[in-house]
Amino acid sequence: MGKQEVKTRNGERVAIVAGLRTPFARQSTEFSQVPAVDLGKMVVSEMLARTDIDPKLIEQVVFGQVVQMPEAPNIAREIVLGTGMNIHTDAYSVTRACATSFQAAVNVAESIMAGTIEIGIAGGADSSSVLPIGVSKKLAANLLALSKTKTLGQKLNILKSLSFKDLMPVPPAVAEYSTGLSMGQTAEQMAKTHGISRAEQDALAHRSHTLASQAWKEGKIQGEVMTAFPEPYKKWISEDNNVRHDSTLEGYAKLRPAFDRQYGSVTAANSTPLTDGGAAVMLMREGKAKELGMEILGYIRGYAFSAIGVEKDMLMGPTYATAKVLENTGLELSDLTLIDMHEAFAAQALANVKMFASDKFAQENLGRSKAIGEIDMDKFNVLGGSIAYGHPFAATGARMMTQTLRELKRRGGGIALNTACAAGGLGAAMILEVE
């Protein structure tokens, strides 16, 4: 029997009344000059306009940004100040790597459950194009010392100690701080450990692009994606530019492995690309939504987060978090209408799919007597996944939530699982319900 109830003390559910995102654009394309904070303001402003809600009714904004910009460390507060909300609106930022906007949504939901707010906005935005480029440790130390000198001679002595190498810019780190391993290296390890072939990975990537292309062509995605006019406002973007509308399985086989050149199977094509974009959802106390006459997309029925070791299988978070959320809600895998899993890499997604069905893995790692269950692939990532749409780190969770709720509504309702892996061995899982 499930023990988790996402309800207020009066028994009201937490409703999601709106979801919106920018188009997702590959690094250094349409959003090449747009920082994450502006992507966040862009999508929240449009959401407020579309819902026609008085911005001053928003009581809390929880937003995230994985690649932090030093000049705007609290993206949530900048969004409040830049979108016409009440200046007294509470706003704070969170980060849970690729599961950031799931965390943001949970935080707002918990505020509603506690009765401290009735309406809130959650989401995330990231730019892989506008990045904080750092300096070497030696240059940083010398610049600090330089600021404390008083004479020209002292300044010259400090500057003379610097080499050309010390002056080189330092890009943001792509590896785990604790292990030095990149996500791609972990995906390679998971492919080898769990027997995920190159052909299987390429097939999933092709499936993702094919289904995403079909969803766009059938008009299923347009309603949740705004048209953006990035500076200098001469062009606009209204669709994701990573989706391959001409995807062929043969095309994937041409690419060389990206992380293990000799024996690897993870390529740029069967992985998510670096992406720019923002996404948000609006949550309300169920009664408040009805009082305001808002259409309810659906409800959060349950959620769970997980944390595992980072040395091996670091991206197995969906399996661990899903086991927890199903236990929390008293559901079985067979109860689900849809399953949407973040595709950081085809290898990672397929390894998780495999472990969902493994009794041995469940007994040794999940504290379960039997497997979570074998995933019915007719329910899995039915509109394509992150490999096709792209992955602005903090925005992906909100994209998945909105996309899933709208698809459930098209199908006449049901229950769905959203789940994602995240850096640091973290995982997230959320159960959504549409009546």
UniProtKB/Swiss-Prot annotation:
Where does this protein come from, organism-wise?
Vibrio parahaemolyticus serotype O3:K6 (strain RIMD 2210633)
Q: What class of enzyme is it?
A: transferase
Q: Is the keyword Acyltransferase assigned to this protein?
A: yes
What function does the entry list? Catalyzes the final step of fatty acid oxidation in which acetyl-CoA is released and the CoA ester of a fatty acid two carbons shorter is formed.
Q: Where in the cell is it found?
A: Cytoplasm
Q: Which residues form the active site?
A: C98, H391, C421
Q: Which family does it belong to?
A: Belongs to the thiolase-like superfamily. Thiolase family.
Q: Name one GO cellular component term.
A: cytosol
Q: How does it assemble?
A: Heterotetramer of two alpha chains (FadJ) and two beta chains (FadI).
Keywords (alphabetical) are:
Acyltransferase, Cytoplasm, Fatty acid metabolism, Lipid degradation, Lipid metabolism, Transferase
Q: What is this protein called?
A: 3-ketoacyl-CoA thiolase
Q: What is its main location?
A: cytoplasm
* GO MF entries: acetyl-CoA C-acyltransferase activity
Q: What is the lineage of its organism?
A: Bacteria, Pseudomonadati, Pseudomonadota, Gammaproteobacteria, Vibrionales
| GO process terms (BP) | fatty acid beta-oxidation
What EC number(s) does its UniProt record assign? 2.3.1.16
